[in-house]
């Protein structure tokens, strides 16, 4: 265990005090600094990314009782009540400044990127997420399991690197779970968002043909990501793509037009989802699901090796 006496006992943090609006966020300069437990490292945060999940966690959107507008009284990524006060922030880049018992001394001083899905703390089938079940990066310091703090050697700034963990790991998990292969036609919704834009780039690296659905005003932004075809969100999907033409759908949107996604999937097609920014309640005709032999993947828990 390394010496923490040179570190402050209090720190600055943005603290969530309950579910609701921005009024539930409190800027504190006297929040207790965490100390690393056995097997953990203490990180001085260089940068922390902001994601939709921070909003969703704040309003309790992940709860099973979530209404269409996301209003609930409690709820975390696991659907259990969130403990308050809570420091949010799933995306963290920083440097190791203290070690818990049993951690390799060589870790001290390392620049690290933290895996938002803390796989080493997996509880049965449920994952522990930074900034939800455990305090995250909206603070000067954060303590995480050493196994989930990955050493990096990059010319990118801390701010640039902090944009990677949640978006890119989620996108890679979607592609991994759905088994995207070279030559397949992959349709990606919300393609200019964090997860969507990452999915476009990662699917292209796998050799897939990528069709990206975007809002009209963001078509030019998405063009630089390398999608083979850009489809305006305003255009009816069946008209733009045609029935039974897509091998895999990567979806982070959901919403009222969701049934059209199953229409464009080929028989034995695969659908993977990890978001519902247009609304979580959708209409499903079970006949469409079983007569086309479709496979649906809900993707939150990350496969081993996805982050690496």
Region locations from a protein language model:
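Hydrophobic/small residue at the entry helix of a nucleotide-binding pocket
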Residues: 170, 194-195, 256
């Amino acid at each position: 265990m390394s010496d923490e006496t040179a570190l402050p006992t209090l720190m600055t943090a943005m603290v969530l005090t309950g579910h609701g609006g921005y009024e539930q966020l409190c800027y504190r300069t006297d929040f207790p600094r965490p100390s690393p437990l056995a097997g953990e490292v203490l990180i001085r945060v260089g940068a922390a990314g902001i994601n939709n999940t921070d909003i969703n966690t704040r309003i309790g959107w992940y709860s099973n009782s979530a209404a269409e507008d996301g209003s609930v009284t409690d709820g975390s990524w696991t659907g259990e009540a969130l403990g308050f006060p809570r420091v949010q922030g799933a995306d963290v880049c920083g440097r190791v400044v203290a070690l818990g018992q049993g951690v390799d001394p060589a870790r001290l001083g390392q620049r690290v990127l933290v895996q938002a899905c803390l796989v080493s703390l997996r509880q049965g089938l449920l994952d522990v997420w930074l900034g939800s079940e455990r305090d995250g990066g909206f603070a000067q310091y954060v303590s995480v399991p050493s196994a989930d703090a990955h050493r990096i050697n990059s010319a990118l700034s801390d701010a640039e690197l902090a944009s990677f963990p949640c978006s890119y790991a989620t996108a890679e998990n979607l592609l991994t779970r759905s088994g995207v292969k070279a030559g397949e036609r992959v349709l990606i919704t919300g393609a200019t968002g964090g997860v969507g834009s990452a999915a476009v780039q990662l699917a292209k690296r796998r050799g897939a043909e990528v069709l990206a659905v975007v809002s009209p005003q963001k078509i030019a932004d998405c063009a630089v990501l390398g999608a083979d075809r850009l489809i305006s969100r305003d255009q009816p999907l069946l008209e733009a793509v045609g029935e039974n033409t897509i091998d895999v759908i990567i979806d982070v949107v959901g919403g009222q037009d969701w049934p059209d996604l199953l229409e464009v999937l080929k028989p034995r097609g695969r659908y993977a989802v990890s978001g519902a920014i247009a609304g979580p309640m959708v209409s499903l005709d079970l006949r469409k699901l079983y007569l086309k032999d479709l496979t649906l993947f809900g993707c939150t828990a990350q496969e081993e090796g996805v982050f690496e």
